[in-house]
């Protein structure tokens, strides 16, 4: 692992994998190399995604693993990441094997909490937005339960940068959960951003400017 960044609820971990003896593996185009699967094992519930990107100039394969922990108690713990089967986009398995890497997760969470109290219209009624928690890698909004409101109809539609880019178009994970007292919706971005570059969050078609 070469870099880790996270907040109270999720994290990105970037791995560098050096590929040696490419000639022996008969790899003609190193841009075509990827892992068939990369998955995370922790003691806590986790969801997320991953992607790989080979940069020819530096001779390494990078695997970025995103994780949404569904809990705020994972940091300062450890987890395992398994890389399975080195493959080629030519539908060829170059090496059929699993490689497991263990890592201690220890980072300083960076996030900003914005209290709201705004009323959000939802099919069937209204509910109240308690607040938005935003970080360089994710956004999270929590709502109080409204009367006669179908809470499952609440969702984050867009996270818009000042440049006009919508981070929802490239989000890597997201989800929601409802309980007796309300609902929480979250979205993990596909890249790291500066919080000050985020202009607004749109929830159920209603835009909240930050």
Annotated model-derived regions:
Residues 1-210:
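Alpha-helical, hydrophobic structural elements that either
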């Amino acid at each position: 692992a070469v870099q880790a960044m996270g907040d109270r609820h999720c994290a990105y971990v970037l791995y560098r994998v050096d590929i040696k003896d490419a000639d022996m593996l008969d790899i003609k185009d190193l841009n075509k190399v990827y892992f068939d699967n990369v998955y995370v094992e922790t003691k806590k519930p986790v969801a997320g995604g991953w992607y790989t990107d080979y940069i020819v100039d530096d001779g390494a394969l990078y695997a970025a693993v995103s994780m949404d922990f569904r809990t705020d108690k994972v940091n300062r713990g450890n987890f395992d990441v398994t890389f399975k089967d080195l493959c080629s986009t030519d539908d060829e398995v170059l090496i059929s094997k699993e490689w497991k890497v263990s890592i201690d997760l220890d980072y300083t969470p960076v996030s900003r909490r914005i209290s709201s109290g705004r009323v959000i219209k939802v099919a069937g009624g209204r509910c109240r937005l308690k607040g938005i928690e935003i970080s360089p890698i994710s956004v999270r909004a929590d709502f109080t339960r409204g009367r006669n409101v179908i809470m499952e109809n609440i969702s984050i539609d867009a996270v818009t940068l000042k440049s006009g880019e919508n981070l929802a178009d490239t989000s890597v994970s997201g989800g929601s959960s409802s309980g007796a007292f309300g609902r929480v919706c979250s979205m993990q971005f596909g890249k790291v951003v500066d919080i000050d570059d985020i202009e607004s969050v749109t929830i159920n078609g209603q835009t909240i400017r930050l």
